């Protein structure tokens, strides 16, 4: 990022010299195959001032002065583009910074407090692959934001009182729970049976309605039944998330906002705006001036609240906890999240930033907990790690079973996380576990293997070349094209973190990690390291391998993926 800051300063000064003035945002920097940074500012200025963009770019470049010790090595005009190339000082400083900062490399200065909510699946059964896209996007975003310097708290909003939970509670009383199974799977078994019963006997629906009304008025026995069922499901969900390397700082129950009176208060505040009306006995909010034709129901005709109402109260509470609020929702929440933001805006409450993701599926088809037509995340993890174990066994038959299991778990879970997060959230995707585990496909196993390869090279160097990691080196000896490419790729890490944090796009880090692994493998393929004849060159190249190891490990850690030292 410092390279861009210096380019910004130099370019703005040159533009002033030729008689114009621009804001930083108008410099329009982008990456280019021809330069480390390229600016399109000549296009913008030429269109405003009716000049030739090529000629203007040349005039600006002629006015540029590169100060002593700058990270900028060279500036040139290529048609209307102004291209910046990093200088030697930039490369040397990057190597030094990685070696000194290690796992802190790429960390930003302290910033605001963020409250990020993700996953928040209904506690009516195990998580399936559709849920875990939410978990993986949310967890990776939290990791990126933390590395960027934000103080992040991650929350799971527990639906502990909606209709589905009433069905779960009723099911737990009506059918025997098989507690020899994982608790969320046992809940799913009875939930599925209950839905079959409800479809056959519509009269049972009245019992569900009665349970919901009892919870709403605070009936302690019914609340206790709900709590017991929810706790069982959440315990199983937490196990699954832990295996996926996803951790929430806080689980917040929906019912607390009803008990505290905050739901009642927010309904009254919405009424005070004059936006509410009655529709068949239900209280609805008119949001037509926000572009929503459909009204938002906030109270049923029987006076009970809805999930949406309680969610509004939750968001009001969240707004007082942090500077920024971020929600990760599936595409099916696009309408309701828009209505929620509009309603909060109408009553003067800070709106959340919403990350909407499209759905992920398996080649086998769609998933639904209600009908039991789903493959649980647990089953998926088991399948993937079994397949990973077979790969480790074929590649490293001499290792212990314990080693194979550890690596298989790291590689299998890493493959799931990477394959899901590498796709931009707004695009739907199909998770193919066979492709995700393919070492040649440049997914997580490829990146993990690159890290393990770097570790292996360094271990070998300690034995064969008496390499000392603390030894002073001369980064300026790293002059081969593949060395320079690798250094420049490592130097991009902090700007990638910044981009992912600014745009809430975790996939940019996944793509970067793969490109970094590519750069490292290209370097090792074309340049002798341990076999380098000159001792100083050898030491510098081994230091570069160590730098690559550090930045690969930092990238994997920020993606929530393990970085094995051996595979």
From Swiss-Prot:
Pfam families: Arg_tRNA_synt_N, DALR_1, tRNA-synt_1d. A motif ('HIGH' region) lies at residues 121-131. Disulfide bonds: none annotated. It catalyses: tRNA(Arg) + L-arginine + ATP = L-arginyl-tRNA(Arg) + AMP + diphosphate. One of its GO terms (biological process) is arginyl-tRNA aminoacylation. Keywords: Aminoacyl-tRNA synthetase, ATP-binding, Cytoplasm, Ligase, Nucleotide-binding, Protein biosynthesis. Its EC number is 6.1.1.19. GO terms for molecular function: arginine-tRNA ligase activity; ATP binding. Belongs to the class-I aminoacyl-tRNA synthetase family. This is Arginine--tRNA ligase. It comes from Methanosarcina acetivorans (strain ATCC 35395 / DSM 2834 / JCM 12185 / C2A). The lineage of its organism: Archaea, Methanobacteriati, Methanobacteriota, Stenosarchaea group, Methanomicrobia.
């Amino acid at each position: 990022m410092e390279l861009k800051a210096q380019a910004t300063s130099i370019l703005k000064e040159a533009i002033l010299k030729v008689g114009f003035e621009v804001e930083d945002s108008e410099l329009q920097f982008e990456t280019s195959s021809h330069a480390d940074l390229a600016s399109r500012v000549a296009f913008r200025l030429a269109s405003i001032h009716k000049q030739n963009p090529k000629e203007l770019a040349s005039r600006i470049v002629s006015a540029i002065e590169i100060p002593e010790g700058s990270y900028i090595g060279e500036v040139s005009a290529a048609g209307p583009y102004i291209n910046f190339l990093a200088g030697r000082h930039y490369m040397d400083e990057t190597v030094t910074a990685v070696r000194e900062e290690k796992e802190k490399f790429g960390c930003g200065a302290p910033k605001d407090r963020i409250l990020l909510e993700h996953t928040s699946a209904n506690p009516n059964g195990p998580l399936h692959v559709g849920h875990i896209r939410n978990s993986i996007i949310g967890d990776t975003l939290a990791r990126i934001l933390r590395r960027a310097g934000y103080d992040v708290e991650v929350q799971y909003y527990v639906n502990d009182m909606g209709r589905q939970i009433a069905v779960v509670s009723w099911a737990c009383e009506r059918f025997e729970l098989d507690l020899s199974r994982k608790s969320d799977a046992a809940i799913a078994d009875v939930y599925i049976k209950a839905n079959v019963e409800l479809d056959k006997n519509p009269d049972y629906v009245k019992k569900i309605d009665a349970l919901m009304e009892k919870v709403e008025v605070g009936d302690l026995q019914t609340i206790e039944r709900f709590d017991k069922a929810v706790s069982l499901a959440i315990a199983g969900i937490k196990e699954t998330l832990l295996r996926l390397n996803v951790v929430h700082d806080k689980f917040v129950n929906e019912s607390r906002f009803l008990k505290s009176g905050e739901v009642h208060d927010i309904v009254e505040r919405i009424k005070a705006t004059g936006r509410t009306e009655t529709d068949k006995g239900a209280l609805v909010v008119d949001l037509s001036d926000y572009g929503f034709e459909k009204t938002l129901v906030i109270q049923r005709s029987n006076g009970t609240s809805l999930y949406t109402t309680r969610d509004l109260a939750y968001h009001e509470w969240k707004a007082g906890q942090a500077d920024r609020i971020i929600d990760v929702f599936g595409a099916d929440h696009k309408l309701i999240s828009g209505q929620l933001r509009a309603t909060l805006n109408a009553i003067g409450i800070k709106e959340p930033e919403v990350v909407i993701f499209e759905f992920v599926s398996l080649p086998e088809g769609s998933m639904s907990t209600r009908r039991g037509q789903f493959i649980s995340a647990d089953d998926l993890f088991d399948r993937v790690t079994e397949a990973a174990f077979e790969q480790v066994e074929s590649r490293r038959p001499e290792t212990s079973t314990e080693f194979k299991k550890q690596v298989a778990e790291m590689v299998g879970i890493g493959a799931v996380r990477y394959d899901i997060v590498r796709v931009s959230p707004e695009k739907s995707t199909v998770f193919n576990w066979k492709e995700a585990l393919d070492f040649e496909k440049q997914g997580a196993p490829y990146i993990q293997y690159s890290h393990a390869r770097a570790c292996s090279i360094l271990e070998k160097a300690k034995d064969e070349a008496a390499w000392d990691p603390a030894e002073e080196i001369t980064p300026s000896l790293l002059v081969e094209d593949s060395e320079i490419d690798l250094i420049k790729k490592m130097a991009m890490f902090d700007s990638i973190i910044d981009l992912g944090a600014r745009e809430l796009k975790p996939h940019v880090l996944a793509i970067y990690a793969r490109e970094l692994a590519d750069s490292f493998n290209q370097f090792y393929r074309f340049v002798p390291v341990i076999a380098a004849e000159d001792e100083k060159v050898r030491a510098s190249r081994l230091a570069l391998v160590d730098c690559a190891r550090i930045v690969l490990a930092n990238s994997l850690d920020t993606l929530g993926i393990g970085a094995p030292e051996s595979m």
